[in-house]
Structure formats: structure tokens, C-alpha cells
Amino acid sequence: MSDIAERVKKIVVEHLGVEPEKVTEASNFIDDLGADSLDTVELVMAFEEEFNVEIPDDAAETIQTVGDAIKFLEKNSA
């Protein structure tokens, strides 16, 4: 697992209070990890802070799984 993937997983575990083994790249934040719309906004903000990147609203709407977040951040972080 890449450094970015590990950091994303850590943020998801901390923000959603889920078991680390439940967090896979295929995990959907809402359907699999029990997040609500506010949780997803907070996750996006946490990703922005952790990776020092801005995630535009249109991109944020496409980030629905852990893998989506990892792919976006691998492509757009410094």
C-alpha cells in the first residue's frame, strides 16, 4: 500500500471511527463505512489539509470510495 493510501486509510479510520480492516480501496464511504453527507465533507476537508491540496466541489462529488480518494490524491498532490 502506498504512503498516500496509508494516510487516506488513517484519516478515514479516525474520522469515521471504523475498524482499519473494514477500510479497503473498494469501501464506499456511505454504503460500506456508514458515513453521512457531513462526514464526507469533513473527510474531503481532512484530505485537503493532510495533502495540502484543494479538492474542487465537482471532484469531491466523484470521490465516493477510499480508492477514489487515493487516485485523486495520487494524481493531484505534490
Curated annotation (Swiss-Prot):
It comes from the Bacteria. GO terms for cellular component: cytosol; membrane. Its main location: cytoplasm. InterPro entries: ACP (IPR003231), ACP-like_sf (IPR036736), PKS_PP-bd (IPR020806), PP-bd_ACP (IPR009081), Ppantetheine_attach_site (IPR006162). One of its GO terms (biological process) is lipid A biosynthetic process. The modification O-(pantetheine 4'-phosphoryl)serine is found at S37. Pfam families: PP-binding. One of its GO terms (molecular function) is acyl binding. Transmembrane segments: none annotated. Keywords: Cytoplasm, Fatty acid biosynthesis, Fatty acid metabolism, Lipid biosynthesis, Lipid metabolism, Phosphopantetheine, Phosphoprotein. 4'-phosphopantetheine is transferred from CoA to a specific serine of apo-ACP by AcpS. This modification is essential for activity because fatty acids are bound in thioester linkage to the sulfhydryl of the prosthetic group. Pathway: Lipid metabolism; fatty acid biosynthesis. Residues 2-77 form the Carrier domain. It is found in: Cytoplasm. PANTHER family: ACYL CARRIER PROTEIN, CARRIER DOMAIN-CONTAINING PROTEIN. Carrier of the growing fatty acid chain in fatty acid biosynthesis. Belongs to the acyl carrier protein (ACP) family. This is Acyl carrier protein. It comes from Methylorubrum extorquens (strain PA1) (Methylobacterium extorquens). The lineage of its organism: Bacteria, Pseudomonadati, Pseudomonadota, Alphaproteobacteria, Hyphomicrobiales.
